[in-house]
């Protein structure tokens, strides 16, 4: 039987093309049942307050960077979305007088400007590099801060960024949020065309993707307008540069942070269910993490919500 057409964008793959049994099973999950989805290689953590949630996220930076030395440098790959952890990272480094000069940081993704064929400049209001620098790195005291050469931001020419993953720097953890389309970074589902017209790419095919320029699923564009631009879809680029699965599998741990601001109650349940049950389908890119050896999903309990029907 052919796969369903997307309910959102018929020319694309996404989670609405999944079997109804998966959809219904995920929607039935309570927070307590989500905790029980944990298995070897997949940990589920719930935080009762946002303060605890974002502090725990910030501490992953500190824990990674404290391991770094000049001879054995260590880094973390981090997202924009969420961002609330970033000022906490800078405050912790400064207040603990933590020397992170040997440490590294990889940005996960960046917007692509189709007019110039390059990444958006840091002057762009939605620039992820701009946000990382303004919210975190420019706030760390210069005497403690790593040099610019240790900050790796994706560019349209991805060669230097991809090479930075193979220079002997250990990535202790890759953090991420989860978008409405169930991506990490901008690893979106692919368009439904060509050899992928009748079936999405196989997991093995998707896993071969490296850092690259991508076309964004319409749901991703709408989400970023909602979360970052007051709903102004026209200001959101339609293409982006994203870290790929190849780089993701070079991280010792993948840590996904669900505050309830980005993906919705159903999405937060769906990906945990698929990762736990090892249901890997590239129409839900986050499900590929089922095959990573060390994944942790972190939830703010107050942001998990419910999939019960409520009319507004």
Annotate each predicted stretch with a short phrase.
Residues 76-86, 177-183, 261-263:
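Gly/Ser/Thr-rich loops at beta-strand to alpha-helix junctions
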Residues 89-100, 122-124, 189-198:
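A glycine- and small-aliphatic-rich helix-loop capping segment at beta-alpha/alpha-beta transitions
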Residues 23-45, 98-175, 235, 299:
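Ligand-binding beta-strand-loop-alpha-helix segment within the catalytic cores
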Residues 58-72, 248-249:
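Glycine-rich phosphate/diphosphate-binding loops that line cofactor/substrate pockets in enzymes
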């Amino acid at each position: 039987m052919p796969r369903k057409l997307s309910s959102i964008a018929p020319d694309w793959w996404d989670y609405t093309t999944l079997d109804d049994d998966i959809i219904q099973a995920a929607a039935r999950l309570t927070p307590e049942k989500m905790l029980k989805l944990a298995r070897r290689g997949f940990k589920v953590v719930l935080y009762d307050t946002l303060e605890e949630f974002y502090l725990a996220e910030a501490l992953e930076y500190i824990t990674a960077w404290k391991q770094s030395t000049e001879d054995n440098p260590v880094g973390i790959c981090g997202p924009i979305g969420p961002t609330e952890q970033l000022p906490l990272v800078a405050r912790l480094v400064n207040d603990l007088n933590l020397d992170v000069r040997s440490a590294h940081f990889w940005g996960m993704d960046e917007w692509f400007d189709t007019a110039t064929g390059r990444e958006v400049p840091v002057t762009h209001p939605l620039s992820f590099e701009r946000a990382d620098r303004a919210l975190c790195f420019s706030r760390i005291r210069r005497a403690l801060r790593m040099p610019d050469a240790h900050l790796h931001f994706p560019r349209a020419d991805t060669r230097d960024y991809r090479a930075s993953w193979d220079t002997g720097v250990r990535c202790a953890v890759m953090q991420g949020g989860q978008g409405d389309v169930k991506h990490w970074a901008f690893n979106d589902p692919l368009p439904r065309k060509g050899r992928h017209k009748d079936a999405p790419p196989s997991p093995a095919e998707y896993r071969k993707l490296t850092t690259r320029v991508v076309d964004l699923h319409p749901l991703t564009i709408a989400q970023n307008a909602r979360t970052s631009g007051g709903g102004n879809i026209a200001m959101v680029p339609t293409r982006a540069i994203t870290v790929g699965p190849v780089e993701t599998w070079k991280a010792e741990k993948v840590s996904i942070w669900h505050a309830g601001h980005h993906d919705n109650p159903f999405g937060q349940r769906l990906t945990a269910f698929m990762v736990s049950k090892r249901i890997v389908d590239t129409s839900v890119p986050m499900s590929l993490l089922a095959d990573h050896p060390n994944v942790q999903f972190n939830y703010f309990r107050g942001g998990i919500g419910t999939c019960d029907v409520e009319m507004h």
